[in-house]
Amino acid sequence: MDSKLFALEVLNNYQRKKIDESNDEEFYSDPKFVYHLDANFRQNLSDLYEREIDNYSTVLDLMSSWDSYLPKGKKYKKVIGHGLNKQELEKNKIFDSYWIQNVNSSKQIPLYKESVNYCLMVAAWQYLQYPENLTKEIARILSREGKIIIAFSNRAFWHKAPNIWTSSTEEERVKYVRKVLISNGFNEPKIIKKFTEPALNIFNFLNKDPFYCLIATKE
């Protein structure tokens, strides 16, 4: 049996459970035209994309919304969007196409093998109940030397995040994402962490979202 064809499970059943097991499509049925990450995080991400993504590439923005944070000056062959809310995806003008799918209930990505150069996931991994299967699918659709770029902070809709995320420290989350990646078709990821010293005021108005990013190349 070829192990490359099957996802290697990392989580147990308890770790996949969520506080709110209700339908995800219903929760995301109303568009949320707000930024879930602060301006500093978004700038860090755009700067990283500027460095990491080659011009004339095909990019998949998985579990996306109305803004992809992709640099406007870069030239893309194609940008494909995915998410759960049609209105949000329609507003994202950088998309050449998009589709709607709940990856927790339907794990196969409807794209051809080796058809994408980069897969982006922003503030998304924390909602995956079956990350192993999805990671294997991402490896399938990525081109040779294709990359996955996963970015997250310490924010989430906590009732919709599985136990593995809500019960872990920030450092444990990084280790968990890494383990899934290297177990399911990716090389050792590059890990980026950026923190800002707490602002010296009692209200912490100037504190910034921590920035975590894992970049891994397909095996």
PLM features per residue range, with description:
Residues E132-K147:
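A short glycine-rich, Lys/Arg-flanked "PGG" loop and its adjoining helix->strand segment in the class I
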Residues R51-I109:
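Class I SAM-dependent methyltransferase SAM/SAH-binding core
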Residues D2-D54:
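Class I SAM-dependent methyltransferase Rossmann-like catalytic core
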Residues N117-E132:
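A short SAM/SAH-binding and catalytic strip from SAM-dependent methyltransferases
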Residues K147-R178:
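Conserved class I S-adenosyl-L-methionine
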